[in-house]
């Protein structure tokens, strides 16, 4: 579709103050001229300069069906790098759909999902990491997640990777000259310099990889299983974190028989909470199925909040739950601290990252839990304005580049020939170029834009 003029609604569906229909392509002004009539007869769409706006009517044939504003952007000074016209009509799906239909009748083609950002990428307005950041910014729920995406959109990751590429390229140029032209008087690279450059690249990539999980939590949120025995306070905890009575709470054991789901925003982290059935032996087939689902949800979760009744001694079910949390991102919450304590927390402490006394009926405990979750997931240590990796594709490329740089450094230290070092440096450069999009195949481009919606 590259080369055609495309049209789509660029705003979210549903009622609103305005809706925006975006045109992009060489015929954008021609299409706009057929569907938009300036209120000032002396103003002509074809003569509109970039970064200007005109008020007028939207028309289909001779019928005016709405009034609004047309914004004009001349190539290459637009989001896509092409001529772009953004038509702002009144919100509501009927008017916006009619405006799109009028644009299509005037010669535009329907835009594919992500088509505008794809064109921005192909026209050099955005790098690949910046293009991926557009969707991250749209999807962000918290301020830190949005800041991470905005940093990537502003080129933070591209600059960081570019610095590593420049260092390796300079190294490789010298290596290639030394290996390929032995008859020339090319000075051999100093071993200490080789180790220093390769070590610096490896360390930088290690930092990006190390922060990937926490960065992903800020961008995408995390599934959180709330598990524990009946009446330990799981549903009360869900209601505390949600800020309203999402789950039924009664003194009757086994009240929760199926998984109750609720998305909540805790600071800058979105938690997809799953309140599960109480863990105990039961003859009830329905409750037993709920307990089976509880264990399954525990295995799948990216975060576990294990709730224990602090007013009772640990039971066999408590200890089994603790053992299953070993090595997992799990926090033990010893509930009911407002009552005399009977629970020996030392019995479960070895299995958890942290053990916290709480009262799931008090707002103060919510703040304690929010801070603990941020510490455990590493999000409290993240600089939201720094370079960060987004998505499995970027992580995979960074891992390959890091491993290749490490291999080159090991080759130097083992005394292998410089040709072996050169091969590893080449592999690292290839991986970094794939990360930034300089080696972009059509299949990889499709992967980048498959998450996008129509209109972006």
Language-model features: locations:
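Short glycine-/small-residue-rich Rossmann-like dinucleotide-binding loops
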Residues: 242, 277-278, 302, 309, ...
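Generic enzyme active-site microenvironment
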Residues: 273, 307, 333
